[in-house]
Structures are given as C-alpha cells and as structure tokens.
C-alpha cells in the first residue's frame, strides 16, 4: 500500500500481530533503474520484519528483472510482482493492473524476474481489467508455468477500484486452476471474515491490507481467530496513542536512513528536512489510531498542519490528558 506499508508500519504490525508474511510498498522498477533515492529507501529492511517480500511494479521485463536482482541483494525474502494496482498514473505506464490487458507481456515479466533471482517470485493481481473478462485464472496458469511460486488474488476487477464488495467466488474459481499456494484478498476485516474466506474459497491464506491501517491490532485479532486462540482485548487509548508516537518516530528515522529515532538524536545532525517530509506523509495516517474516539476529528484537523515530531507529540499528549481528565474518579 503506497505511503502506508512503509517500514515503520510494518514493524508495528509485526510487534503487535506476531508471525506473518508482509510486503513493502510497491517499488517502481523504472525509478530504481534511474537511481531514485526515495524509491531505494522503500526497499530497506529491518531484521524484525522478516519474512518480508519486496513488491515491484513495471511494464518492461528487462527493467523488472534488474529491479528484482537489486531487491534480492537488499535482502528480500520474496520478490512480489504487482499486477493489481488500478491507479491511473500506474496503469498509463503499462504497469500494475494494466498488464491484465496484456497477458503476453505479463508472462514475459514473470519469466524475466524468475530467471533473474534465486528467491521465490510471487504475483498479486486482480480478477481482470473489467467485468467483460475474468482474466486471472488463465493468467495465473501462465504465471505458475513461468515459475511463480504463489498467487494472490484481490477479488475485484481493476475498474472497480475499491467500490462494491469483493467477490470471493472468484477466488474459489481460481482455486480450481491454480496449483501453487493461492492467497485471497479483499474485504477481510475480522477473524470471522478470514475464516469464512478460507472455508468458502479453499484458498491457502488471506492477505489483509486496508483493515490494518490505523488498527494494526486487527491483524492480531484475525491471526488469533485463524489459529483458534483467544481474541486479544481491544487496545487502550494510551496504547493507541503510544503506538502512533512510535510510528511517527520510526518514520522520521527512516527518512534519515536510520532504524531508530534515538540514532539520529545522538548524531546531533540537522534532520529538520527529513522530519518535515516524514511528518507530512503521516498527516492522514496518524489520526486513524484514534478514529471513532470523542474529539478525534479535531485532532485530525490539527495534525494536518504539523511539520515536526514535537508538534505531533504535543497534540497527542494533550488529547490524552483531556480524555483522562474526563474519566470518573474513584
């Protein structure tokens, strides 16, 4: 998920939810080809994240193979090829879900990437470009024959975006033709959703995306439900705010090419520009940690004007103090 599943988010999810395969934000192969520093930063991996797949996108087999080799060198456990992004700026380059309209190029990309690396190669795709053709089954067969070791299907068509409900029956149809592990994706928000998807489709696992934005505890609940363990209690307001603080601090560190905020504090170097970039990129995400709480909309409005970590922490701490003051005494 672009600008969401960065290292800070992934580390928080891993700490809260425990074992599970995660993927980076998608990485533009063409940007890597031209040496974009910001894009290289997306491929950095922290040891606590593993296993971790680096997801790449592009429309040229040779450039995709080159990027896959770099991702492997940077420590990826899996190379995942994105053929599901429906956003126009991606599709107009012949990348992402646009490849659903060009199965020959899509297959050539999979072959090129598989031939370029030793790590497993996986593919994430949508059901098809539009309702006129459920393209995924035939394409998945070609991908597995080309060497892909896992397929993830988001059970919507590209033209849908995120509109309507995911059609899990499409995953069941895919199960009939795909012999490699098949992962279902789309509208899994609760433990009950995950179990229903597994039981109704025969898929081998579930991928959760949007449900974890601002609520990484959803992953812990879903995992517990799938494993038959007790469902964890909902986090306290204090825990959610502390997690938002950790998220912000780790993301500032990432923009400074460090793992922990304390590392950059010790150097004494000026990190104000990196801090500004990091905090601005989190303006829409951090308020989601307290979504639904009284006064959350006011907090969101204030954070949208923040440029520094100190400003964010002051707003969150002030909000927590206000909420504590309203609690009954005794």
Spell out what each predicted region is:
Residues 59, 101, 307:
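Residue-level signal for the nucleotide or nucleotide-sugar donor/cofactor binding architecture
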Residues 2, 8, 108, 116-118, ...:
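Alpha/beta catalytic cores of nucleotide-metabolism and tRNA/nucleoside-modifying enzymes
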Residues 1-77:
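Glycine-rich, positively charged N-terminal anion/phosphate-binding segment
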Residues 11-17, 65-79, 83-95, 103-180:
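Alpha/beta enzyme core
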Residues 1, 27-29, 57-59, 84-86, ...:
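Active-site beta-loop-alpha junctions enriched in small/polar residues
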